């Protein structure tokens, strides 16, 4: 897959910054000179939230190909940094939905993301999940010196001290060869064993890619990032925080010019929840009739899906996902056409929504879109939640 014109500009901006970084040996000065060259010195005030570590941000709208941009950024960043024996990437994501999507794509040798990384690193690439790292599965001192090691991890599995988070701090006999090969850590992590996964990654001094980085600006998140001991931090987001060091930005008009916005966005405001419900059902039915009437339908199957956004539990008189399911059934919709997808309930697990054999036409969620869930058949979003955010749904 070739980079779009706006994506080429983003990578060109990154390369220019890296050139300036090599010339100045000062990441803040390089940032200042970069924006000075673009006649925008006011944008060149570097926010040093990670002292000693270059920290840049790509501001790209949702659907603009941030993941592919990150894949294209890995090689230039490593080429610009001082030589190291190991090349490790920590790829941080904010949710399990994005985690599974990213892991699946990066492990798939036929996927454009993996093909790009393979091309840049001579196919000497290994992609790891947290569990694979904990198990020492193809993860050892010899392997990490001979390949690019990409570790796809969730924020919560490293910034929390719950049961899952603690695994990264605990003694791990599977990783003992690392502690022998790497020696005493220069930057020991508090309360982490020398054989702990977190400490081993710390000693590899990885490039850290932070997907949806606006979710990683709390004190706990910054502590997590520092504990990774990164050589470089690259933020990816459509809605950067004010302390982000934006090195390149893309607007929605550029996406439209490159045909990245493939469908019109039509917004309706209804007076009450009943109208939202019935209008969404009617619109979905009309879309399915149109899809079935197309002569090419036999070659390209389409089953339009409504994504209903309900209120979280615990709010009195709110339309929670249980109540919403009951209302849909009361209108005559078969129960097998309805599924719930929340942080606690996932009725979509092991379901192929694109299969003609799948009956699901209505999915009830709370924060699935915010968490990165995606489905090509989900043409309609009907929100019954009381939303006030200006940047998410």
Please give the residue ranges for each predicted region.
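RecA-like P-loop NTPase motor core of helicase/translocase proteins
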Residues: 1-393
């Amino acid at each position: 897959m070739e980079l779009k014109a706006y994506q080429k500009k983003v990578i060109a901006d990154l390369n220019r910054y890296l050139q300036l970084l090599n010339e100045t040996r000062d990441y803040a000065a390089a940032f200042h000179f970069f924006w000075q060259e673009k006649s925008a010195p006011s944008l060149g005030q570097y926010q040093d939230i990670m002292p000693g570590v270059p920290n840049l941000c790509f501001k790209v709208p949702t659907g603009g190909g941030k993941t592919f941009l990150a894949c294209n950024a890995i090689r230039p960043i490593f080429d610009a940094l001082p030589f190291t024996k190991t090349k490790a990437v920590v790829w941080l994501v904010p949710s399990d939905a994005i985690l599974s999507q990213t892991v699946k794509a990066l492990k798939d040798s036929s996927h454009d993301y993996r093909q790009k990384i393979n091309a840049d690193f001579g196919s000497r690439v290994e992609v790891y999940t947290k569990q694979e790292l904990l198990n020492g599965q193809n993860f050892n001192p010899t392997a990490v010196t001979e390949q690019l090691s990409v570790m796809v991890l969730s924020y919560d599995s490293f910034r929390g001290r719950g049961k899952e988070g603690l695994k990264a701090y605990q003694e791990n006999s599977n990783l003992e060869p690392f502690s022998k090969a790497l020696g005493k850590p220069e930057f020991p992590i508090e309360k982490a064993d020398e054989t702990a996964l977190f400490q081993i990654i710390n000693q590899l001094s990885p490039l850290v890619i932070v997907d949806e980085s606006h979710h990683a600006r709390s004190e706990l998140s910054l502590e997590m990032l520092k504990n990774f001991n990164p050589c470089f931090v690259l933020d990816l987001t459509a809605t950067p925080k004010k302390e982000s060091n934006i090195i390149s930005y893309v607007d929605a008009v550029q996406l439209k010019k490159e045909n990245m916005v493939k469908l019109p966005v039509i917004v309706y405001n209804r007076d009450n929840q009943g109208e939202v419900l019935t209008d969404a059902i009617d619109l979905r039915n009309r879309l399915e009739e149109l899809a079935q009437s197309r002569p090419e339908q036999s070659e390209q199957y389409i089953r339009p899906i409504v994504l209903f956004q309900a209120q979280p539990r615990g709010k009195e008189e709110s339309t929670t996902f249980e109540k919403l399911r009951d209302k849909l059934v009361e209108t005559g919709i078969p129960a097998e056409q309805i599924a719930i997808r929340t942080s606690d309930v996932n009725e979509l697990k092991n379901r192929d929504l694109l299969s003609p054999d799948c009956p699901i036409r209505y999915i009830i969620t709370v924060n699935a879109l915010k968490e990165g869930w995606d489905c090509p058949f989900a043409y309609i979003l009907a929100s019954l939640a009381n939303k006030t955010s200006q940047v998410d749904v």
